[in-house]
UniProtKB/Swiss-Prot annotation:
GO biological process, one term: isoleucine biosynthetic process
Cofactor dependence: Mg(2+)
UniProt name for this protein: Ketol-acid reductoisomerase (NADP(+))
Keywords: Amino-acid biosynthesis, Branched-chain amino acid biosynthesis, Magnesium, Metal-binding, NADP, Oxidoreductase
Molecular function terms, GO-annotated: ketol-acid reductoisomerase activity; magnesium ion binding; NADP binding
Residues that, per the record, bind substrate: S250
Coiled coil: none
Length: 326
C-alpha cells in the first residue's frame, strides 16, 4: 500500500464547505479542533449535556444533531457504533440531499448496514490510527497521527479529494495515510480488538496472573510480571519492531520466548482466530453486538462488573498507586 503525505492532499477541497462533527467525545473533540486550526469551518452537533457544554467552552457553534446535519455539507459521525443507526434515521437522514457527504472514522455502520445512505450522497472514511488525545497532541506538536481513508460512495467524483483534505486538516497526512476500503478497515479493526489487543491480551494477562497467584506467588509480583511490564515490551515493539525488542531484552528472555511461546499459543490458536474472522466477516458478531446493545447491554455490564472485582484489578490499583506523584 502506498503511503499518502501532505503533497498529495489539497485543503481547497474543503473551501466553502461546513463540516458538522456529530458527537464530541475524545475523537470528536480532537478532530474538530484540528480541522478548525487548519481553517475548516466546523460546527458541532450533539445533544444537551456535558459534551454540548464542552464544545461550547471550546468556542464551537453547537447545536442539535438535526440542525447540524441540515447546515453542513459534510456530516462526520463520531458516535458509538451501536448508536449510529438510530441517530442517522431520526436526525440525519431527513436532512440529506444530493451533493452532501457522510463521513465516519470506523466503517461499522456502513459495512453492517445500520446506515444505508442514499445513492446520491458521497460516503467517506477518515480514521486516525490513535486515540483522540494522541491525535490532538501530535497535531499541536506540528506532526500528525497516521491514519486511513476510504471512499465508499462517490457520485460527485470528488469524494477522495474531500477525504484527503479532511485527513490533511487533521494532520494525518503529516504522519502518513493509507487508502483502504471500509470493509477492510472494519473487519481488521474488529479482528485486532477481539483477538489480539483486547480479547487476546487481556485474557493472557489474567491467565498469567491467576496461574502465579494460584501457585502461591505474591499477587503484587504476579501483577508486575504479567500486566505492568507489558507496557515496557509493547513500547519496545512500537518503537522498533519485534526484532528490536528481542535485541534489548536478555538472552534468557528471548530464548524463553521461542522455548515456551508456541506451547502457550500453539498453532491451534491461529485456527480459532480464523473462525473469529469468519464471524466478523459474516456479520454474526455485529448482529450479536447490536442485539445486546438494543437490550441495554446487560451481558456487557455484567462482564464489566465482574472484571472490577477480579483480583488482577484490585491488586493493580494498589500497584498503580505506587507510581502516582504526590
Amino acid at each position: 500500500m502506498d503511503i499518502i503525505h501532505d503533497n498529495a492532499a489539497d485543503l481547497s477541497a474543503l473551501n466553502g464547505k461546513t463540516v458538522a462533527v456529530i458527537g464530541y467525545g475524545a475523537q470528536g473533540r480532537a478532530q474538530a479542533l484540528c480541522m478548525r486550526d487548519s481553517g475548516v469551518n466546523v460546527i458541532i452537533g450533539v445533544r444537551p449535556g456535558k459534551s454540548f457544554d464542552a464544545a461550547a467552552q471550546d468556542g464551537f457553534q453547537v447545536m442539535s444533531v438535526a440542525e447540524a446535519a441540515e447546515k453542513a455539507d459534510i456530516i462526520h459521525i463520531l458516535l458509538p457504533d451501536e448508536s449510529h443507526g438510530a441517530v442517522y434515521e431520526a436526525e440525519i437522514k431527513p436532512h440529506l440531499k444530493a451533493g452532501k457527504t457522510l463521513c465516519c472514522s470506523h466503517g461499522f455502520a456502513y459495512v453492517f448496514n445500520t446506515i444505508v445512505p442514499p445513492a446520491d450522497v458521497d460516503v467517506i472514511m477518515v480514521a486516525p490510527k490513535g486515540p483522540g488525545t494522541e491525535v490532538r497532541r501530535v497535531f499541536e506538536e506540528g506532526f500528525g497521527c497516521p491514519g486511513l481513508i476510504a471512499v465508499h460512495q462517490n457520485p460527485s467524483g470528488k469524494a477522495r479529494d474531500v477525504a484527503l483534505a479532511m485527513a490533511k486538516a487533521e494532520g494525518l497526512t503529516r504522519g502518513g495515510v493509507l487508502e483502504c476500503t471500509m470493509a477492510q478497515e472494519t473487519y481488521e479493526d474488529l479482528f485486532g480488538e477481539q483477538n489480539v489487543l483486547c480479547g487476546g491480551l487481556v485474557d493472557l494477562m489474567k491467565y498469567g496472573f491467576e496461574t502465579l497467584t494460584e501457585a502461591g506467588y505474591p499477587p503484587e509480583m504476579a501483577y508486575f510480571e504479567c500486566v505492568h511490564e507489558a507496557k515496557l515490551i509493547v513500547d519496545l515493539i512500537y518503537n522498533g519492531g519485534i526484532q528490536k525488542m528481542n535485541s534489548v531484552i536478555s538472552n534468557t528472555a528471548e530464548f524463553g520466548e521461542y522455548y515456551n511461546g508456541p506451547q502457550i499459543l500453539p498453532a491451534e490458536v491461529k485456527e480459532r482466530m480464523k473462525e473469529s474472522l469468519k464471524r466478523i466477516e459474516s456479520g454474526k458478531f455485529a448482529k450479536d453486538w447490536l442485539e445486546e446493545a438494543a437490550k441495554g447491554a446487560p451481558n456487557l455490564k455484567a462482564k464489566r462488573e465482574a472484571l472490577g472485582q477480579h483480583p488482577v484489578e484490585i491488586v493493580g490499583a494498589k500497584i498503580r498507586s505506587l507510581f502516582e506523584r504526590n
